[in-house]
């Protein structure tokens, strides 16, 4: 057997062992990238033509209402946004 065959067999065996060790009790592979949470409030533009982000808006994927709070009118706009966003 050539040394390249032996190296290939070792790589396959190591990969199978790593795959076996990465499985959870339920048989599913744990992937931390699937647990990404999107915040309900996002700092964004108040108007379309302005390029300054002065508003906190409730744009979460599960938000029932699309509300925005301007930082210039409401100094605590971030707190109001997180308190006012209604999540299903």
From Swiss-Prot:
Q: Which UniProt keywords apply?
A: Disulfide bond, Signal
Q: Where in the chain are disulfide-linked cysteines found?
A: 41-57, 46-85, 55-81, 58-68
Tissue-level expression: Expressed in leaves and flowers.
Record-level GO BP terms: suspensor development
Alphabetized Pfam families for the sequence: ESF1 (PF18209)
Give the signal peptide range: 1-22
Tell me its family: Belongs to the MEG family.
Its protein name is: EMBRYO SURROUNDING FACTOR 1-like protein 7
Q: Which organism is it from?
A: Arabidopsis thaliana
Q: Which gene encodes it?
A: ESFL7
